[in-house]
């Protein structure tokens, strides 16, 4: 379980890994698009796809090792189990947010997101 302060600290601390994930995601998408066409890319071939996929999984494993729930990678969506007013919640960070500014009850999901006040 995370407090809001702990979730915010982890996002700030892990921002370099999150940025790495975003870069890998972009490289992988570009490489796969190139290889789907004429089959050539300045970024490489199938071996480079496999290497990027391995790097992507490594970053995801790192995030998961902190008990962070990675809900999406395009965009990156991270949930941190916590408690608010006696209820189980997920502190929610979405790619582009400067901080953990949202939460939702576990049973409500993303559609139930509310701003942290």
Regions found by a protein language model. Give the residues of each.
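Glycine-rich, aromatic-bearing surface loops/beta-hairpins
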Residues: 64-117
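Short, surface-exposed, charged/polar-biased interaction segments
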Residues: 28-31, 35-42, 49, 77-80, ...
């Amino acid at each position: 379980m995370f407090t809001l302060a702990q979730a915010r600290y982890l996002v700030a601390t892990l921002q370099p890994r999150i940025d790495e994930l975003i870069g890998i995601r972009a490289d992988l998408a570009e490489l796969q698009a190139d290889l789907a066409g004429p089959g050539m890319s300045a970024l490489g071939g199938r071996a480079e796809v496999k290497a990027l996929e391995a790097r992507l999984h490594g970053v995801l494993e790192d995030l998961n090792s902190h008990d962070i729930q990675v809900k999406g990678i395009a965009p990156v969506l991270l949930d941190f189990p916590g408690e608010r007013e006696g209820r189980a919640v997920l502190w929610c960070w979405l790619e582009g947010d400067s901080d953990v500014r949202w939460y939702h009850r576990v049973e409500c999901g993303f559609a139930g997101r509310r701003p942290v006040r």
